[in-house]
């Protein structure tokens, strides 16, 4: 299995300009749920090219973006400099070992990343540790629409991006968040319709991987096709599919 560091260092330039990541529909929902305040000290975990951090920066006191991929951080710093955003800092570090003291932040966010985390329970524990009492944690991530197709979804995602680990259901997220000590405040489904050709290009898929994805979709049963919203052209090729996304606000 490829590491997230390798995958995103390789594709950093594409992610910096990707409209899905830079301004996709989960971003305004995340910002609204976060209810940013001018006094907030914010941590953006797995910041990537800094899209969430740089959106929040004008609304808060300070934002730190954390990521394991140095090329992604370089893109974030370049954008901050180009846009003259001065209250951000981008640092290297793991979501499962956050390099900051206890109760350092009033708001933690993470967008389009936890499906890469092997130890989600450790990530949740670390977020709770660095949050101040009463602090907010807002996360947006891909989910599996139901437990019955979870295995198919993960195989599909991993074929496209070997650094993918697992897309959990909303029920699994609720259980793990509760165990970690969070209060579940609100959640909202934000489905994305993704063009297949764009999706495979974004990950740098090989021809073999694209063929395997076409085969998986072509042989999927009706339940999978319906829940994933897979659309085909007249030749049987994939046009697009629905990527189920959840945005949730938790509080310490």
Task: Enumerate the language-model features and the residues they cover.
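A short glycine-rich, Lys/Arg-flanked "PGG" loop and its adjoining helix->strand segment in the class I
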Residues: 121-136
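A short acidic, Gly/Pro-enriched loop at the edge of an enzyme's catalytic core
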Residues: 96-107
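Conserved Class I S-adenosyl-L-methionine
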Residues: 49, 184-252
């Amino acid at each position: 299995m490829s590491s997230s560091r390798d995958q995103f260092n390789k594709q950093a330039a594409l992610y910096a300009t990707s409209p899905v990541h830079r301004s996709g529909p989960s971003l305004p929902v995340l910002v609204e749920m976060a209810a940013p305040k001018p006094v907030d000290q914010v941590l953006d975990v797995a910041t990537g090219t800094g899209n969430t951090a740089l959106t929040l920066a004008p609304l808060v006191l300070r934002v730190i973006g954390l990521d394991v991929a140095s090329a992604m951080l370089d893109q974030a710093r370049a954008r901050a400099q180009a846009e003259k955003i001065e209250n951000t800092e981008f640092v290297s570090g793991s979501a499962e070992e956050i390099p900051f003291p206890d109760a350092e932040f009033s708001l933690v966010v993470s967008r389009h990343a936890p499906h890469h985390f092997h130890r989600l329970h450790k990530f949740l524990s670390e977020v709770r540790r660095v949050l101040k009492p009463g602090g907010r944690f807002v996360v947006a991530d891909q989910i599996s629409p139901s437990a019955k197709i979870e295995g198919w979804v993960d195989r599909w995602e991993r074929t496209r991006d070997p650094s993918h680990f697992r897309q959990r259901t909303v029920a699994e997220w609720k259980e793990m968040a509760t165990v970690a000590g969070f209060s579940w405040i609100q959640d909202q489904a934000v489905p994305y319709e993704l063009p297949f050709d764009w999706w495979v290009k974004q990950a740098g898929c090989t021809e073999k991987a694209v063929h395997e994805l076409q085969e998986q979709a072509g042989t999927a049963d009706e339940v999978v096709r319906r829940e994933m919203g897979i659309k085909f052209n007249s030749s049987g090729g994939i046009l697009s599919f629905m990527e189920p996304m959840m945005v949730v606000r938790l509080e310490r």
